[in-house]
Amino acid sequence: MRVPAQATIAVLASAVSSPLNDPQIYDLGKLGWTLSSPALNRTVPGHLPSQVHLDLLRAGVIDDPYHDLNDFNLRWIADANWTYTSDPIRGLGNNTHSTWLVFEGLDTFATIKYCDKQIASTNNQFRQYAFDISEAVKDCTADPVLSLNFGSAPKIVDQIAADPASPQWPFGIQQSYEYPNRWFMRKEQSDFGWDWGPAFAPAGPWKPAYLVQLSSEQNVHVLNTDLDIYRQGQINYLPPDQTQPWVLNASIDFFGSLPSNSSMSIAISETNSGAELTTQSLRNITILNGSITGVAVLKDASPKLWWPYGLGEQNLYNVTITVSDGVRSLARVTKRTGFRTIFLNQRNITDTEIAQGVAPGAHWNFEVNGHEFYAKGSNLIPPDAFWARVTTTKMARLFDSVVAANQNMLRVWSSGAYLPDFMYDLADERGVLLWSEFEFSDAMYPVDKAFLDNVAAEVVYNVRRVNHHPSLALWAGGNEIESLILPTIERSYPDQYAKYVGDYETLYINLILPLVYENTHSITYSPSSTTEGYLDVNLSAKIVMAERYQNLTEGHYYGDTDYYNYDTSVAFDFSQYPVGRFANEFGFHSMPSLQSWQQAVDPEDLHFNSSVIMLRNHHYPAGNLSTHNFHNTSMGMGETTMGVMNYYPVPDKTDPIANFSAWCHATQLFQADFYKSQIQFYRRGSGMPERQLGSLYWQLEDIWQAPSWAGIEYDGRWKVLHYVARDIYQPVIVSPFWNSTTRRLDVYVTSDLWEPVSGTVDLAWMDLSGKPIAQNARTPKTAAFVVGALNTTKIYSMNINERALPDPKNSVLILSVQAEGHLPNSNKKSTLTHQGHFTPVFPKDLMLVDPHLELRYNAKTLTFTVQAKAGVSLYTWLDYPAGVVGYFEDNGFVLVPGQKRDIRFVMQEDKTDGNWVQDVTVRSLWDQTTKT
């Protein structure tokens, strides 16, 4: 057993800057900690912040939780209670007015004791907790030890579910993945399993904690700050008037006491240059329920605007808020922010818009600083099953990959955790809008008073915490409740539908909506991620927002869409894709690379249908705690198999590991092409009657090494999908739309720029050896075009049967666009290029030719040069070895014979001392057909 030291904890620099009477802030993470449990026959070192699995891993008690089938093998950890115990706390001030414990996050069911006296119990992972322990400190006669006992979340929610007073829902409504009853807890819902991740149900002090001592009665500690910047007169659900001055509303949450004559002032300066924008006093000061609030109208200030990536600069400002009593500073807080308006437009289509060709219905698109724009991006899931080990460095790499793929928005999927501030900081700096959601998904939830009160505190804290970030784009109530759960109830239990609509409105409209509106003027709220929008908003009505639900009119378009179709036979039939105003979820799963599999799976299990590979695939989920989910997972594996077999060469390599790797790559090819087909379709919709202005695919990244919908693997390696996203999210693209039934090919140019763009598209038919087809198959070699702002235009249409193609199986059409135009908020004209291709048959039926790819590396320029010597190289793929994290600036492209492509590798981490370069390889679709 570890003998505790007599710890004297260090005093931190105060978060409340005041030279006269700072509180003393002690970082509890500086203490020594131990971890114990009845399930463990010894005590091991603990840490804060941390989680139980991580401390057991550090102590050598368990293997890597991500290894093999440890998500099953380590369930004993989630089933046990665990206690974190501090070393005795010495050095606390004796002449203090009050002493407080502040926890930024406890996961989840925790009992807190100090000096063997119970202080409090908690039941919400997402809340900040502050407890006055002044009396416990003064009365302490035993060892001044802090203990945090974490109960087993799976067992506790099972007990809640078994209580006769707890709500019960009809069969088939609540979606379980592994552990049941997740809806009874305010904890990361995916901790109990999801179809892309494991169910570890972790516990522990997952965020920092502090002990704070106030030296006098008029002394405060800042807990949270709500900085709201908006246009004067702005209302959440209406478009802001861009001619109005900026308003700054500052609200500081604190404990302690402020004099009634307290004043507030602000100083705003540019973050980069330090240039002062303005300083002024706030008006209408109120002190109520532990918050001090004031407002200022910035009439004479002209800040530079903050814009999303690709639309302008990310101008940032530091706002310093000072609270004083007229003589001295009592509190001072600095927040970095930006000046922008962001608005989700759900208003009805006007007669003028209908006359311009927009289909009737309602809008569903975002506007930034008064401008419509096309939202290009993906869905962010939890980056790790254990948040305590998520680092700023790794997330910076992830966000760098987001903007490298030309994405300007991420939907932060509900039922993970609210993102930490540092991730919003990264988004602020890079121009990534974060559509944020409250943590509810794919289930109905309790609506009793205790549950609602708990949620209310969670909502208020998190809305206020992140409101200053210009990257914050939206608050949504939850995931797929309106689009999936309520319709399921209506179909299966129509007599109970009204009751559950009422429960839905109680939580997402009556409770959450007013709390959002009370704490921010600048952000729109939508009760559900996928929704048909609202009929009306009336702030004085009993139900403030009247949702449209299924009150739809034929021929009208409303709301956003999600789309999952695992029948791969229709994957590239774009008539199957939903027509709507915005696509917020769509996708298909694929395997990670061999390099990622090797991080978690033993060599003997590296084949497509091994038990380990199959059981790490959670699509389809077991729906319970079964460890032999072969029936459901085989359906998911079968879908990926059919996606390959229907369209691509089937790998059949002699070496089993090489064959497994080729199969993994093949599933990624299908996934990437399927997403490309959909994104092209949705982007084309910007110029169609639906006026479609957003596509966010499912999903950005992996939580672990397993089959999933991700485009970025767990360690940061890009799948084929992310390279395709980088390509197809360029500002101006050329896209082929092929109808295999009518044999008609339409070629479109789509632009998301804010002004018309003109240019040309080159159309070049050739056979797969690279030889041009005679007379270019009766196709014009060049087509000129003009495409309107945020629009699309058809530049050519042909029937393949009428083309002079000697053999469709030996034909490829290369499409190359070159356009001139201004990027948003740029005075400089840019040349914009993009290349696409089309084959009249699917890749599996092509008469492929070995392109004899040659790869060279120039150490001086740090570039790779790829050349096809003998044939057309389709899906040209550069791959790098393990030990490196980064991405190629281009990948998955087409090369024609004689063409060279110079490609730089963007290094994010190198553990090979530069030796990785020797193991970079290149392959093409041809290599999928070979035995070696």
From Swiss-Prot:
GO biological process assignments: glycoprotein catabolic process; polysaccharide catabolic process
Q: What pathway is this protein said to act in by its record? A: Glycan metabolism; N-glycan degradation
**Glycosylation site list:** 41, 81, 94, 249, 261, 284, 289, 318, 348, 538, 551, 609, 624, 632, 659, 739, 791
SUPFAM superfamilies (UniProt xref): (Trans)glycosidases, beta-Galactosidase/glucuronidase domain, Galactose-binding domain-like
Role noted for this protein = Exoglycosidase that cleaves the single beta-linked mannose residue from the non-reducing end of beta-mannosidic oligosaccharides of various complexity and length. Involved in the degradation of polymeric mannan and galactomannan.
Is rRNA-binding one of the keywords?
no
Q: State the superkingdom.
A: Eukaryota
Q: How does it assemble?
A: Homodimer.
Quote the Pfam families the UniProt record gives: Glyco_hydro_2 (PF00703), Glyco_hydro_2_N2 (PF22666), Ig_mannosidase (PF17753), Mannosidase_ig (PF17786)
Under the heading InterPro entries, the entry gives: Beta-gal/glucu_dom_sf, Beta-mannosidase-like_N2, Beta-mannosidase_GH2, Beta-mannosidase_Ig, Galactose-bd-like_sf, Glyco_hydro_2_Ig-like, Glycoside_hydrolase_SF, Ig-like_fold
Q: Where is this protein chiefly located?
A: secreted
Task: Name the family.
Answer: Belongs to the glycosyl hydrolase 2 family. Beta-mannosidase A subfamily.
According to UniProt, the name of this protein is Beta-mannosidase A
Q: Gene Ontology cellular component?
A: extracellular region
According to the UniProt entry, what is the EC number of this protein? 3.2.1.25
UniProt keyword Hydrolase, yes or no: yes
* Segment forming the signal sequence: 1-19
At the top of the EC hierarchy, this enzyme's class is hydrolase
Name the reaction it catalyses.
Hydrolysis of terminal, non-reducing beta-D-mannose residues in beta-D-mannosides
Q: Which UniProt keywords apply?
A: Carbohydrate metabolism, Glycoprotein, Glycosidase, Hydrolase, Polysaccharide degradation, Secreted, Signal
Active-site feature positions: E480 (proton donor)
Q: Where in the cell is it found?
A: Secreted
**What's a single GO MF annotation on this record?**
beta-mannosidase activity
